[in-house]
């Protein structure tokens, strides 16, 4: 994959995440700054999402764990657990907010 394709895929996913957070009923602050998305919850916990250009990966840090996502078959898939990015983020947001969150 070329770097330009990677950046376009990541930016598209970041836009989707921002829109999904804005549309959910749970109070989550979503901030994009210098290629890093920070989700901040009322309890002060955070989820950090950033891109790793040299590896062509998206990395996610939650309160419980860290995840590395590769682009496979049209989806961002965790390279250890095999979960899709938005599915994993929905579960992580639910755990950190204490409310059911569905992002996709």
UniProtKB/Swiss-Prot annotation:
The keyword tRNA-binding does not apply. Signal peptide: none annotated. GO terms for biological process: iron-sulfur cluster assembly. It comes from the Bacteria. PANTHER family: FRATAXIN (PTHR16821), FRATAXIN, MITOCHONDRIAL (PTHR16821:SF2). Belongs to the frataxin family. HAMAP family: CyaY. NCBIfam families: FeS_CyaY. This is Iron-sulfur cluster assembly protein CyaY. It comes from Tolumonas auensis (strain DSM 9187 / NBRC 110442 / TA 4).
């Amino acid at each position: 994959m070329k770097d330009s394709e990677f950046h376009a895929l990541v930016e598209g996913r970041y836009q989707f995440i921002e829109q999904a957070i804005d549309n959910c009923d749970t109070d989550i602050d979503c901030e994009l700054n210098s290629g890093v998305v920070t989700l901040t919850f009322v309890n002060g916990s955070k989820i950090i999402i950033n891109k790793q250009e040299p590896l062509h990966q998206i990395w996610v840090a939650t309160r419980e764990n860290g995840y590395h996502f590769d682009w496979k078959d049209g989806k961002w898939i965790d390279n250890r657990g095999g979960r899709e990015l938005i599915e994993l983020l929905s579960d992580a947001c639910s755990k950190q907010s204490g409310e059911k969150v569905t992002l996709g």
